[in-house]
Amino acid sequence: MTTIEYLFVSLSLIFLGGYHATFFYQTKKTPGRTEVGKAHARRSVWVDRMIAREDRILAIQTLRNWTMSATYLASTAILIAAGLLGFLVSVDKISTLVLEVNVLGSQDAGLLTLKLVLLIANFFAAFFNFTLSLRFYNYVALDIGAADQSASQEERKEIVGHLIRAANHYTWGMRGYYLCIPILLWIFGPLWLLAGSVLTTVALYRHDHVAGHRSI
């Protein structure tokens, strides 16, 4: 890589890595400031209300919607990863076109291969998280179906824990989709990588934080 590419890659990692480290810290320490933290609190209320109902159709329908969404995104992620694997076979053919528009970055075809490998790994990670999300949603369906209205606090906390873990893996899977934007742009040069990282970070900040707690 060229010196300027090292610089832009480092800045991109600082933007994305620093933002996510801060975001997950806030989710744990001050959950009321983040949408994820507030959603976790609502999930606890949701579990209590679903257990209190004799008719669990609403719970079943809600879980069905969540599992269908995770299934679709997992399938899409693995299909994209498989398609990108096909590009690796013909990387020499596509490298000529890509390197023509990569003005500031390295002209090494091996680096292009590395970028594609990172993109593939990113989608495999997204697929893995969505499948884990499905696993825990299935646990929740079983837990709520087996729980009665006299369920203890320990049982309720276990159900909430499974639901939160399912939601967390879904969130991490979605991060894989978001992070593919700067990685994909990096193929066309480090300047595009930096621009994509900054725009992705700003967009995530505005969607991850409660409106009253945003500073930008």
Q: Model regions: which residues?
A:
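Membrane-interface amphipathic/juxtamembrane segments adjacent to transmembrane helices
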Residues: 24-63
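Hydrophobic alpha-helical transmembrane segments and adjacent short intramembrane/lumenal linkers
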Residues: 149-175, 185-186
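Transmembrane alpha-helical segments and their cytosolic interface motifs
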Residues: 61-85, 168-194
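A cytosolic-side transmembrane-helix exit/cap motif
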Residues: 212-216
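Alpha-helical transmembrane segments and their membrane-interface exit regions
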Residues: 15, 199-211
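Juxtamembrane "helix exit" motif at the C-terminal ends of alpha-helical transmembrane segments
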Residues: 80-104, 186-194, 200-205
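Hydrophobic alpha-helical membrane-embedded segments
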Residues: 5-34, 71-85, 116-137, 178
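Juxtamembrane non-transmembrane "cap" segments at the membrane-aqueous interface
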Residues: 89-98, 138-162
